[in-house]
């Protein structure tokens, strides 16, 4: 999509910087990775995701794309339309999308905002029916494979594994985890004088690493 931006070897100074890093990572990854499913996550407790999602939608539009911003529920989509009237024609909820849209919408990039385990079936159906790119912002799909039969669990794990994390920033008890496309995963250790890079990994570490 665009020329890759050098990846910093330190954590962003503030949330505004992290948000810009996320936008650049998404734009850099579109067309640069083989996956049609990109995930971007800012995992801060109490984060107001709506304005971040709307600004990402605007950044995608400014880059020449025609995104459809999808919220799982109608109430959140209605609030987004009120907050960003300039984007209201691009904002839908899952039911509106699944019920049928204009033919051209089916080829647009989908920006799905925070799908939860309870949205799993609807979201998977939307993704599998969509021929274009899907960008998932702050999704929580991993928990959708818990508490179901083994066959369904394996199918869901396969769907979860189909996503490429182009951006990830997560505070940890003793540090932080970050990935900015196209770089590796970076683990930071929290020291008395700040955060220091502790190492890099080619894939996301699990909770036991």
Regions found by a protein language model. Name each.
Residues 61-62, 82-88, 104, 124-131:
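Short, surface-exposed basic-aromatic patches at helix termini and helix-loop junctions that form
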Residues 52-56, 121-126:
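A short acidic, amphipathic alpha-helical/loop segment
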Residues 44-49, 75-77, 109-121, 140-144:
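Short acidic, S/G/P-rich loop/turn micro-motifs used as interaction or catalytic elements
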Residues 21-24, 71-107:
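A short, well-structured beta->alpha microelement
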Residues 2-82:
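Electropositive, gly/pro-rich neighborhoods at or near active sites that engage anionic ligands
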Residues 132-149:
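Redox- and metal-dependent alpha/beta enzyme cores, enriched for Fe-S-associated oxidoreductases
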Residues 100-102, 113-116, 125-126:
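Conserved mixed alpha/beta catalytic, RNA-binding, or beta-rich assembly cores of soluble enzyme
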Residues 145-209:
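A conserved mid-domain beta-alpha-beta active-site/ligand-binding segment of alpha/beta enzyme cores
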């Amino acid at each position: 999509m665009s020329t890759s931006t050098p990846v910093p070897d330190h954590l962003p100074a503030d949330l505004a910087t992290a948000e810009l890093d996320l936008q650049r990572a998404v734009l850099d990854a579109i067309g640069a990775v083989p996956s049609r499913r990109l995930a971007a996550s800012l995992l801060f407790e109490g984060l107001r995701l709506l304005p971040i999602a709307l600004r990402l939608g605007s950044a995608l539009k400014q880059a020449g794309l025609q995104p459809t911003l999808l919220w799982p529920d109608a109430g959140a989509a209605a609030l987004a339309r009120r907050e960003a009237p300039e984007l209201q024609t691009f904002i839908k909820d899952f039911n509106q999308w699944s019920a049928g849209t204009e033919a051209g919408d089916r080829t647009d990039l989908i920006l799905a905002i925070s799908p939860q385990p309870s949205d799993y079936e609807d979201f998977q159906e939307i993704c599998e029916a969509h021929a274009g790119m899907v960008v998932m912002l702050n999704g929580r799909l991993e928990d959708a494979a818990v508490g179901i039969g083994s066959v369904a669990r394996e199918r869901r794990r396969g769907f979860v594994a189909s996503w490429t994390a182009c951006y990830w920033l997560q505070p940890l008890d003793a540090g932080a985890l970050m990935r900015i496309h196209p770089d590796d995963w970076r683990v930071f250790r929290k020291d008395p004088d700040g955060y220091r890079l502790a190492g890099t990994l080619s894939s996301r570490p699990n909770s036991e690493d």
